[in-house]
Swiss-Prot record:
UniProt protein name: Glucan endo-1,6-beta-glucosidase B
Subcellular location: Secreted
InterPro entries: Glyco_hydro_5 (IPR001547), Glycoside_hydrolase_SF (IPR017853), Glycosyl_hydrolase_5 (IPR050386)
Species, as recorded: Emericella nidulans (strain FGSC A4 / ATCC 38163 / CBS 112.46 / NRRL 194 / M139) (Aspergillus nidulans)
Organism domain of life: Eukaryota
């Protein structure tokens, strides 16, 4: 779906863009990969109207748990986050190590392979430190030089006809404690203060300008304003009531100053209410251009019994609705840590189950706007976190429409 239906049909229609309805996107060869008629009569909506994507996890925000070989090769072994590694290596050495990583973790061949596997979307986690003048030189330590590599990835994906979501994964001060996905292993979340919001807003303005002025970003249609904030409505209240509406205002004002017409506005994405930070729409006065991100990791849902049929059944009836439109922006095939390597769940001998569970989840998430799997690749020797490895294992089909023929439910 390229443009999204208005959230309240009684109000005037003003649409931000998603691929396939009001704005078509094409590969450099002239192909529209969203304009494919599904061969399956079981589909409730045509395949061309759904996001089917992968996260570029650990490309611009490295999470050592899933990229241990790359982390070691960079000289970062034993460091918990990008901040820690840069501080340990020193700026110049770190910049070269990260440049080598950015130039190899995701390549143009990866992008082309994604399209061959029926994927039409990438979600790119980034940190605020891409805008290097936001970094406090006396107290913060992050790699420099990433923006050119982001341009390259977006250019390749645009040339391939893919839709692109850019996600502020690492916020100033860290939006979660002790989480490498924020770029730093902060003991406390420091994001929830006005001066940190101001830095994030500067990043969003800069990113918005870059997207609209750089042709390599031409297929970026969505900008997520913060990934996975604290799951505590009281602690997140200033974010909901101040940062979110300010982000909308600053992004829209930037677009207006650039002369961008409403049909070319970016979708502005927030975590949905299911995430647990509060109602993201609570203080918004203009949400026609809003989109919502749902992260669904069944492994951490204690209400689902830990057996195969319960997992299939839970996914078959999983309603991720609520805020509209929602994309399930992170999910995987991983199961609870204490059983993941037992005989009943071991990946190599249970491919039939994982294939059924993939189909059940994907079908459920396509009842919303679609899905983005975490992640495209991982260095775990475990396809449950790695889309490309799951395809190689025969768990995920290259013909994604065929998931409806599995009849997992």
């Amino acid at each position: 779906m390229k443009f999204i239906l208005p959230l309240f049909t009684s109000l005037p229609v003003a649409l931000a863009w998603l691929p396939g309805i009001d704005k078509d996107i094409y590969s450099a060869a002239g192909t529209n990969i969203f304009n494919v008629t599904s061969a399956s009569s079981k589909r409730w909506l045509p395949a061309s109207k759904k996001i089917r994507g992968v996260n570029l996890g650990s490309h611009f925000v490295i999470e050592p748990w899933m990229a241990s070989m790359a982390w070691s090769n960079m000289g970062c072994s034993g460091q918990r986050s990008e901040f820690d590694c840069v501080m340990a290596l020193g700026q110049e050495t770190a910049d070269q190590a990260f440049a080598d990583h950015w130039g190899s973790w995701i390549t143009q061949d990866d992008i082309n392979q994604m399209v061959q596997y029926g994927l039409n979307t990438i979600r790119i986690p980034v940190g605020y430190w891409l805008k290097e003048d936001l970094v406090y030189a006396d107290s913060e330590h992050f790699p420099k030089g990433g923006i050119g590599y982001l341009e390259d990835v977006c250019g390749w994906a645009s040339d391939a006809g893919m839709y692109i979501i850019i996600d502020l994964h690492g916020a100033p001060g860290a939006q979660q404690p002790k989480q490498p996905f924020t770029g730093q292993y902060a003991p406390n979340p420091g994001f929830y203060q006005d001066y940190q919001y101001d830095r994030a807003l500067e990043f969003l303005e800069w990113m918005t300008t870059s997207i609209h002025q750089n042709n390599k970003f031409r297929n970026v249609g969505m900008l997520e304003i913060v990934n996975e904030p604290v799951q505590n409505a009281d602690q997140a209240s200033s974010m909901i009531n101040s940062y979110y509406p300010s982000a909308f205002t600053r992004i829209r004002n930037t677009e207006s100053s650039l002369g961008i017409t409403s049909n070319n506005y970016l979708h502005i994405q927030m975590m949905n209410e299911k995430w647990g930070s509060g109602d993201p729409t609570q203080s918004l006065t203009d949400n026609y251009f809003a989109a919502y991100d749902d992260h669904r990791y069944v492994k951490w849902d204690s209400s689902v019994a830990v057996d195969k049929e319960s997992y299939i059944s839970a996914s078959c009836v999983d309603d991720r609705g609520g805020n509209w439109p929602t994309i399930v922006g992170e999910w995987s095939l991983s199961v609870p840590d204490n059983v993941e390597h037992t005989a009943d769940w071991e990946p190599s001998s249970n491919t039939d189950f994982y294939a059924r569970w993939f189909a059940a989840q994907a079908i459920a998430y396509e009842k919303q706007e679609g899905w983005v799997f975490w992640s495209w690749k991982a260095q775990l020797g475990d396809y449950r976190w790695s889309y490309k490895d799951a395809v190689d294992a025969g768990v995920i089909p290259k013909d994604l429409d065929s998931i409806y023929d599995y009849s997992p439910c």
